Amino acid sequence: MDPYKVIIRPVITDKAISLIEKENKLTFIVDRRATKQDIKRAIEEIFNVKVEKVNTLITPKGEKKAYVKLKPEYSASEIAARLGLF
């Protein structure tokens, strides 16, 4: 699956910003057909970082949300700044 089709958009909520600052996690809405491996590969390729783990859930709206924890040597705050979240 094309990495740019896997990631639909970042999530910008108070909880998502808190996760960026406290747990080094980014939150994205992703394609519903994407697997955790697809999401990990897409994030690593697009943002040039290493991913520690990916947690996913389906929202009541029917969207798939992914919580992506980066390895400690990478900063979620820097990625968020590049995305224009800060």
Swiss-Prot record:
NCBIfam families: PRK14548.1, uL23_arch. GO terms for molecular function: rRNA binding; structural constituent of ribosome. GO terms for cellular component: ribonucleoprotein complex; ribosome. Coiled coil: none annotated. This is Large ribosomal subunit protein uL23. The lineage of its organism: Archaea, Methanobacteriati, Methanobacteriota, Thermococci, Thermococcales. The keyword Signal does not apply. InterPro entries: Nucleotide-bd_a/b_plait_sf (IPR012677), Ribosomal_uL23 (IPR019985), Ribosomal_uL23-like (IPR013025), Ribosomal_uL23/eL15/eS24_sf (IPR012678), Ribosomal_uL23_CS (IPR001014). Belongs to the universal ribosomal protein uL23 family. Keywords: Ribonucleoprotein, Ribosomal protein, RNA-binding, rRNA-binding. It comes from Pyrococcus abyssi (strain GE5 / Orsay). Gene3D superfamilies: 3.30.70.330. Binds to 23S rRNA. One of the proteins that surrounds the polypeptide exit tunnel on the outside of the ribosome. The gene is rpl23.
